[in-house]
C-alpha cells in the first residue's frame, strides 16, 4: 500500500504544510500504515489506532520541540513518531538498534520523556511546566493521559499539585479501556460525564450564549470568564477536575481531527491549567481490535486473517498456564482469590474470572493498592494471589515490605514476565525481582516449564505459611526445558557427564543456555554437569553439598548481578569451605534496550557460547 500524504512528512512540522481538507485522508493513511507495520513487527496496536486524530491535531497546533508532549502510557506514541519523521524506522520497531516502542529523548528531541509505566506522566509534566516558568521559557506542556491511568493513585497526587500553571494542558484520552476494561468508581464517573445529555446540552447552550457577549480588553475577558464559571456552577455541577484547579472542557470527539485542531489552537491563550476530555475508540480502524482491544494491546507479529477471541484463548504461554491452573485450584480452595492491576489478559487471570468471578479483582493500574488490598484479604484468612508483571511489582515494593512481609501474611505473588523481556526495552525488563524479594526473606520459586508451574502452584497455595513468590518468563516454554518434566525437587541435576569437574547452575528460562553450554563444552572435550534450581530463595537444602566436589562452578541468571541469586550462592559456597573457581554471569547493565531475548542474552554474555567460552578460559 502506498502512503502519499504520510510520505510527505519527513520532519517535525511537515504536517502543518498539509491542507485541512487532507487531514482525514492522512489519518486514514496513518491508521492503515500502523496496522500493516505493527502486524509485521509486533508492538502496541489498539492504543495507537485510537489516538491518530488527536496526535495529528496536536502536531498541527503545537510547535515541537519548544512545546512538549508527554504520553501516559508511552506506548501510544506511534503516530507522534510518524509525524516527527521516523516512518522508515518502523520496519525495525522494537528490534535491536531500531525504533523504540516508547518515547525516548535519545531518539528525537521531540520525545520529551521516557514513559513505560502508567499514572506518572502528569507529575512529570507539572515539573516541566514549572521549570519553564522558573526559567522564563516559552511553550506549552501537553500530557496525554489514558483513562486507565486514572485508576492509579499517582495521577491524583499530580492533580492535587497542579496550581495555576497556565502553560499546562492535560488531555484525558478516554477510550473506556486501559489494557483490560477499566474498573472502579473513576470509570463510572467518566461514563457519567460521557453520557449525561442534560449536563452537556445545557453546557453547550450556555457557552454559546456567553460567547456572544462582546469583549472589550483583557480585563473584561477575565471578568466574563469568572462570570461564566459562576453561571456554569449555577446550572450544573462542576466536575472533580475543576474542583482540583483545572478548566474542564469536554467531552469532545477525539476522532474529529478538524475539531481537535481548532480546539487545541484556541487553547493556546489560557488563564489556568486545561483539562481536555477527549473520547476515542481503542483499536479504531481494525474491527477485531475494536471488538477486543485488550487482545490487541500488545501483539507479536500477527496474521490479520486469523484472529482469536481473547476471553479463553487456546494459546499456551506461562501466563495462560498460570491463570488456568489457578482457576482449577480455585475449584477446591474457596479461600483463593485472584488480583490483577489492569492486566487480566496479560496475566492469564481471565481464566480465573471466568470460573470464580466473585473472587476475582481487577483493581486498575494500581499496583500499590493491589498488594495492600491482598494484605487485607489475607489478614482475614483468605488466600490472595497477586499476578503482576515483574517490572510493575517495583511500584509496590513498599507495600510488599510493610503490609505483607512484616505481617508475614499468606499472599502469593505471581511474577509474570520475569527475566529478559523482548521488545519493550528498559522500562519492562523483569530483572530485579530475585534480588528485591530475597532481600526481605520472601521465598521465590522459578519453574522452568509448564509441568513445574502446574506442580508448584497448587503446592504453594495449599501450603501457605507466609508470603511466597513464583516467577515465570514471558511467552511459551522451550522444548529443551519442557523435556525435563517435573520431579518436584527444589533443584535437579539436569545434565551429567562421567568424571565432570565443572558444574553449570541456573534457574528458569536461562537453564536452556546451560544445557546448550554443556554440549558445547563436550565438543571441546570438557565434561560438565548442569543443575537447575526450582526454588531460588532460600537456596535449596543440599545444594552446596551437591556442588562441593566440583573444581569450577559457573552460575548464570537473567537478572541483576548485585544482590542476585548468583552472589548468594557464591557466598554460601565460600561459607561452606569450598575453594574452587566461581564464575558468575548475570545482568550487569540494569537498563537493557529493546532487542530479542537471544540478542539480550548475547549482549549480557548469558548465551551458551559465552558461558562455555568463560569455562574454557578458566580451566586452561
Where are these regions (language model features)?
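Surface-exposed loop/turn segments flanking beta-strands in extracellular/periplasmic regions
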Residues: 297-306
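Alpha-helix N-cap/helix-initiation motif
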Residues: 43-47, 113-117, 148-151, 362-367, ...
Amino acid at each position: 500500500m502506498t502512503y502519499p500524504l504520510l510520505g510527505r512528512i519527513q520532519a517535525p512540522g511537515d504536517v502543518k504544510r498539509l491542507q485541512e481538507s487532507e487531514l482525514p485522508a492522512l489519518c486514514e493513511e496513518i491508521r492503515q500504515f500502523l496496522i500493516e507495520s505493527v502486524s509485521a513487527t509486533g508492538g502496541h496496536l489498539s492504543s495507537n489506532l485510537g489516538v491518530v486524530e488527536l496526535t495529528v491535531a496536536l502536531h498541527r497546533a503545537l510547535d515541537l520541540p519548544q512545546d512538549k508532549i508527554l504520553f501516559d502510557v508511552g506506548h501510544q506514541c506511534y503516530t507522534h513518531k510518524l509525524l516527527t519523521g521516523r516512518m522508515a524506522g518502523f520496519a525495525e520497531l522494537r528490534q535491536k538498534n531500531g525504533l523504540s516502542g516508547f518515547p525516548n529523548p535519545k531518539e528525537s528531541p521531540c520525545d520529551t520523556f521516557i514513559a513505560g509505566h502508567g499514572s506518572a506522566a502528569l507529575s512529570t509534566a507539572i515539573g516541566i511546566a514549572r521549570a519553564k516558568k522558573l526559567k522564563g521559557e516559552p511553550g506549552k506542556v501537553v500530557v496525554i493521559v489514558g483513562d486507565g491511568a486514572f485508576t492509579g493513585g499517582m495521577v491524583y497526587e499530580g492533580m492535587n499539585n497542579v496550581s495555576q500553571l497556565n502553560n499546562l494542558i492535560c488531555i484525558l484520552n478516554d477510550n473506556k479501556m486501559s489494557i483490560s476494561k477499566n474498573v472502579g468508581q473513576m470509570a463510572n464517573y467518566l461514563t457519567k460525564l460521557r453520557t449525561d445529555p442534560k449536563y452537556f446540552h445545557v453546557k453547550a447552550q450556555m457557552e454559546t450564549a456567553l460567547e456572544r457577549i462582546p469583549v472589550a480588553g483583557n480585563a473584561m475577558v477575565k471578568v466574563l470568564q469568572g462570570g461564566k464559571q459562576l453561571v456554569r456552577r449555577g446550572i450544573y455541577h462542576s466536575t472533580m477536575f475543576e474542583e482540583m484547579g483545572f478548566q474542564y472542557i469536554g467531552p469532545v470527539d477525539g476522532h474529529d481531527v478538524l475539531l481537535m485542531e481548532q480546539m487545541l489552537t484556541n487553547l493556546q491563550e489560557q488563564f489556568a491549567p486545561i483539562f481536555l476530555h477527549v473520547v476515542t475508540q481503542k483499536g479504531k480502524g481494525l474491527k477485531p481490535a475494536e471488538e477486543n482491544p485488550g487482545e490487541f494491546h500488545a501483539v507479536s507479529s500477527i496474521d490479520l486473517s486469523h484472529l482469536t477471541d481473547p476471553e479463553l484463548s487456546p494459546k499456551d504461554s506461562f501466563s495462560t498456564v498460570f491463570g488456568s491452573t489457578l482457576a482449577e485450584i480455585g475449584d477446591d480452595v474457596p479461600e483463593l482469590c485472584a488480583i490483577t492491576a489492569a492486566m487480566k489478559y496479560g496475566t492469564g487471570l481471565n481464566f480465573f474470572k471466568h470460573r470464580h468471578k466473585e473472587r476475582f479483582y481487577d483493581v486498575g493500574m494500581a499496583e500499590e493498592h493491589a498488594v495492600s488490598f491482598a494484605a487485607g484479604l489475607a489478614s482475614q484468612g483468605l488466600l490472595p494471589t497477586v499476578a503482576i508483571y515483574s517490572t510493575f511489582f517495583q511500584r509496590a515494593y513498599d507495600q510488599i515490605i510493610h503490609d505483607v512481609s512484616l505481617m508475614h501474611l499468606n499472599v502469593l505473588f505471581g511474577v509474570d514476565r520475569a527475566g529478559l523481556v523482548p521488545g519493550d526495552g528498559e522500562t519492562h525488563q523483569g530483572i530485579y525481582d530475585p534480588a528485591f524479594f530475597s532481600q526481605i526473606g520472601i521465598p521465590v520459586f522459578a519453574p522452568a516449564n509448564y509441568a513445574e508451574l502446574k506442580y508448584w502452584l497448587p503446592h504453594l497455595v495449599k501450603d501457605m505459611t507466609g508470603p511466597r513468590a513464583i516467577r515465570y518468563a514471558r511467552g511459551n516454554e522451550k522444548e529443551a526445558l519442557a523435556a525435563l518434566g517435573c520431579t518436584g525437587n527444589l533443584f535437579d541435576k539436569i545434565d551429567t557427564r562421567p568424571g565432570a569437574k565443572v558444574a553449570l547452575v541456573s534457574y528458569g528460562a536461562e537453564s536452556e543456555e546451560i544445557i546448550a553450554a554443556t554440549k558445547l563444552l563436550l565438543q571441546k572435550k570438557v565434561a560438565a554437569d548442569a543443575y537447575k534450581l526450582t526454588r531460588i530463595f532460600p537456596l535449596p537444602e543440599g545444594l552446596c553439598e551437591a556442588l562441593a566436589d566440583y573444581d569450577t562452578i559457573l552460575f548464570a541468571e537473567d537478572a541483576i548481578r548485585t544482590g542476585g541469586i548468583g552472589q548468594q550462592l557464591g557466598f554460601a559456597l565460600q561459607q561452606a569451605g569450598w575453594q574452587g573457581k566461581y564464575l558468575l554471569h548475570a545482568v550487569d547493565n540494569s537498563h537493557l534496550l529493546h532487542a530479542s531475548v537471544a540478542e539480550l542474552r548475547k549482549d549480557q554474555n548469558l548465551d551458551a557460547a559465552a558461558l562455555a567460552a568463560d569455562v574454557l578460559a578458566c580451566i586452561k
